[in-house]
Every structure is written in C-alpha cells, then in structure tokens.
Curated annotation (Swiss-Prot):
Site keyed Increases nucleophilicity of active site Cys: positions: H440
Note: The a and c carboxylates of cobyrinate are activated for nucleophilic attack via formation of a phosphorylated intermediate by ATP. CbiA catalyzes first the amidation of the c-carboxylate, and then that of the a-carboxylate.
Alphabetical UniProt keywords: ATP-binding, Glutamine amidotransferase, Ligase, Magnesium, Nucleotide-binding
Similarity comment: Belongs to the CobB/CbiA family.
Protein name, entry field: Cobyrinate a,c-diamide synthase
Catalytic residues (UniProt): C335 (nucleophile)
Domain notes: Comprises of two domains. The C-terminal domain contains the binding site for glutamine and catalyzes the hydrolysis of this substrate to glutamate and ammonia. The N-terminal domain is anticipated to bind ATP and cobyrinate and catalyzes the ultimate synthesis of the diamide product. The ammonia produced via the glutaminase domain is probably translocated to the adjacent domain via a molecular tunnel, where it reacts with an activated intermediate.
Length: 463
C-alpha cells in the first residue's frame, strides 16, 4: 500500500519540532489536504497542537510501550479518510529508551513505517558547522532516509544561505526551507512543558499565522514530493486493538475533559468507543453533575494544580463523584485524576485546596520534577482494568507527591531499575471499584484494558 507520509525529526529537544510540525500541518490543511497527524512517544501536549492544526485527532506512536504490530495498527487506524500522514518526532532523531536498548526513538518509528525524514536543525548558534551535524545524522544509521533539512532560528536570510550551502555541499542533503528567529513564533511553556490547547487563548490564530509564515519560507511542494515518493507501507497487521467493525454501544463512560484534565491517548478513547462504550464528556471545573445513565468514569491527567481553586469550589461536582464512587461505579483516574481523588492539592505556593477525599493523603506539588520515564509494572491486585499478574507498560511524568496511603496497591514496578519492587497505584472503594495511579497507560499495550473497563461499566449500567 502506498500512502504519502513524512517524519519531522529534530537533532535534539527544542529544535522546533512542534512549532514546525503544527505550522506545516496547518499549511497542508489550508491547501485542502486531510492530514493524519501523529506524535512519537508518550507526550500528551504536542498532540493537542497537531489536533488543532489538522482539525483531526492526533495519535501517539510509541515503539517502547507498544509492540511493532500494535504501533503499526494505531498508525493505520489514524489513516482513515486522510490523504497524507505527518509524524512529529520526539527529542533528537536517535534518542529513545536508552543507549543500550532499542525502542521509543523517532528513528526506529521512521524505520518501522518506511517513512522519509525531514531533519530540523536549530542554527541559532552556528553556521557551516550545521553541515557536520547533518552529515553525522545521515551516517549514524544508513537505514534512515533523511530526505531533506529545515533550518530553524535563522538570524537572517544570509545566515540561512550560509548554512544551506554548507549542508548541500558537505552532507549532500537538500535544504528545503527555514524559519527566521522570531519570539512571536514561540509556543508558551509551563512546568510540564508547552501550554495545553485545552487552556484556550489565541492558539488557533497563532497556528494559522505560523502556517502563513511557513508557506513563505519552506518549500511545501518539495515536502509533498518527498512524502509521495515514500516506499510502500509495511503490511497492515491483523486487527487486535480495534475491531474491524465497531461494536454497538453497550454502556456509557463519562470522560473528564477541560482545562484541568486533557491527557488522553486518542487510541484509548477510540478503543473504548470501538469496543462498545459511548463516551460522554464532562467538565469537573464547570459542570455541576455527571452525564446521565453512565456506567463508568475516566479521569485522565492534566493540570489540576493550575485549576485547583476552581475544582475545589465546585462542590456539586465533588459530591456527585463521591456518591458515584460510594455507589460502586467504576472510576479510573490517572496522574492528575489521582490528585483530584486525593484529600487536597497543595500548590507551588503551599496553598491547600480540598478535593474529593476518596484517596487518603494530600497531593503536594514539588519544586522539581518528582518522577519521569517509561515504566513496566505487574498488576499486584485485580482491579477494574486488569487481573493480577498482568504485565503493563506505561509512562510516568509528575511534579506532585502523594504519601502512600494504607490502601490496596494496584501495581508492582518492574522497571526502571531504581524503582523495582515499589508499589504504584491504589485500589479503593467499598467494592474496589476505584483505580487511581500516576502511571499513564496506553491501552494498546493490552486491548483487554479497554474491554475490561467496558465490561465492568456495563455491569453497573447497560444501555
């Protein structure tokens, strides 16, 4: 199967991948293309920009959390009704789980998808030396097709031309455009990285202006040519994560989605929907009650610490959720969702805001990142998603710390080495119907995660 596709990779973090990927996606959409956008790795924030730019949900591609077949199935799933695929990389092109073990790198994903790569180089502090960087990236792994280069943070057109000529002369790689250094093209950041698109603001205008700028200095026709000349796609795997025909809804699951909670892998939502759950979105910040006739609740990660005052003040929603838990409704909460279920959130200024109190203890924001990285875990006790003994893969990234309450642990950590044997996650509720954890799970690691959530939600409320 032939399908136009391109990978936008950087030589490092802060190369401008999200800026250029979002602007390029929007520029392609303005030309009438239906872009299937993807983000390499476990990040939640960048996919929001690609979703906004493409007006279509962005999927994460992760070759460490997912098997080759599962990752490829997610890729094919995202191609439906699209005419070109754009994949934004993660960190530098060759950066992955570790230097000794493959997995998770942009290069590996490009190789698995047989996709050409456009390499981004931030030239703000160099000139001809940019050629050495490109040459090194080309030679490190000849299996990776670096088909072109985009230069970011050029000081002037003359600066760009100096770098372009050196790269094309010494690295024999075409340079297909640039972006000038411009503080107005910088996406705002906070402690977890870029600001989320769920926080509103003028991001749509920002992305459209970015697309206009990219049209003027980057050869998009050349990018389309590279994408169309990509070799045939690898064979489509047999369906495992998504049924060939979506199931009719058998239950409703309420999904928290607003400024406080927006971290969901699109594949998780699609798997729930395709296997028989009607998803009903609600806002713990703004709504006073849950959607009607639901059988389960899914509260993802996000920035509850930023919206702590609003979450704390919304007593009707807190009362509704507390009652749902007491009634035995299955509730799954990840990271920010876990914080919402705790007694209170203590923010960076040491101000405490009362939360649901389903989970004993206070979630305290730390002055530095508390834990980060890929994680492998064994299910220690049966819960609403998985059975004891099941092995799962996920990602942890949080600034808060919650003292371990005296509740039944959900998982035992198997990886990374410094956390082996530690407990992670909590099973609470009179009927052990609530699962809360800092571990972000991609349901593609095991399709039974989605199926089990649907089954137990159906037992609580059938439609």
């Amino acid at each position: 199967m032939n399908f136009p596709r391109i990978v936008i990779a950087g030589v490092s973090s802060s190369s401008g991948k999200t800026t250029i990927s979002s602007g390029l996606t929007a520029a392609l959409a303005q030309r009438g293309h239906k872009v299937a956008a993807y983000k390499c790795g476990p990040d939640y924030i960048d996919p929001g920009y690609l979703t906004l730019a493409s007006n279509n949900p962005c999927h994460n591609l992760d070759s460490w959390m997912l098997s080759k077949d599962a990752m490829t199935e997610v890729f094919f799933h995202g191609l439906k009704n699209r005419d070109i695929a754009l994949v934004e990389g993660v960190m530098g092109l060759y950066d992955g789980y570790s230097g000794e073990r493959p997995g998770g790198s942009t290069a590996e994903i490009a190789r698995l998808l047989s996709a050409p790569v456009i390499l981004l180089v931030n030239i703000s502090h160099m000139a001809e030396s940019a050629a050495a960087i490109v040459l090194g990236y080309k030679n490190l792994d000849p299996r990776i097709n670096i088909a072109g280069v985009i230069l970011n943070q050029a000081g002037s057109t003359r600066h760009y031309e100096i770098c372009r000529k050196a790269i094309e002369k010494y690295a024999s790689t075409p340079v297909i455009g640039y972006l000038l250094r411009n503080k107005d093209l910088v996406i705002p950041e906070r402690h977890l990285g870029l600001k989320t698109t769920s926080e509103g603001g003028e991001l749509e205008t920002f992305i459209q202006n970015l697309a206009t700028r990219i049209e003027s200095t980057i050869d998009i026709d050349r990018i389309l040519e590279i994408a169309r000349n990509a070799p045939p796609l690898p064979e489509k795997p047999l369906p495992c994560l998504f049924p060939e025909t979506p199931a009719c809804p058998v239950t409703r699951i309420a999904v928290a989605k607003d400024e406080a909670f927006s971290f969901y892998y699109q594949a998780n939502l699609d798997m729930l929907s395709d296997w028989g759950a009607e998803l009903c979105y609600f806002s713990p910040v703004h709504d006073t009650c849950l959607p009607p006739d639901i059988g389960g609740i899914y509260i993802g990660g996000g920035f509850p610490e930023i919206m702590a005052a609003e979450l704390s003040a919304n007593q009707p929603m807190k009362d509704t959720l507390t009652k749902a838990a007491a009634d035995g409704m299955p509730i799954y909460a990840e990271c920010g969702g876990l914080m919402y279920l705790s007694e209170a959130i203590e923010d960076f200024d040491s101000t405490k805001y009362l939360m649901l109190g389903l989970l004993p203890g206070i979630s305290v924001m730390q002055k530095k990142l508390h834990r980060l990285g890929y994680t492998r875990a064994a299910v220690q006790n049966d819960n609403i998603l998985s059975a004891k003994g099941t092995e799962l893969r996920g990602h942890i990234f949080h600034w808060s710390k919650l003292p371990s309450p005296q509740t039944k642990p959900a998982y035992t950590l198997l990886e990374p080495a410094e956390f082996v044997g530690q407990n992670e996650g909590f099973i609470i509720g009179g009927s052990t119907n609530v699962l809360a954890s800092y571990l972000h799970l991609h349901f593609g690691t095991n399709p039974d995660l989605a199926k089990n959530f649907i089954r137990i939600s159906k037992d609580f409320c059938t439609i």
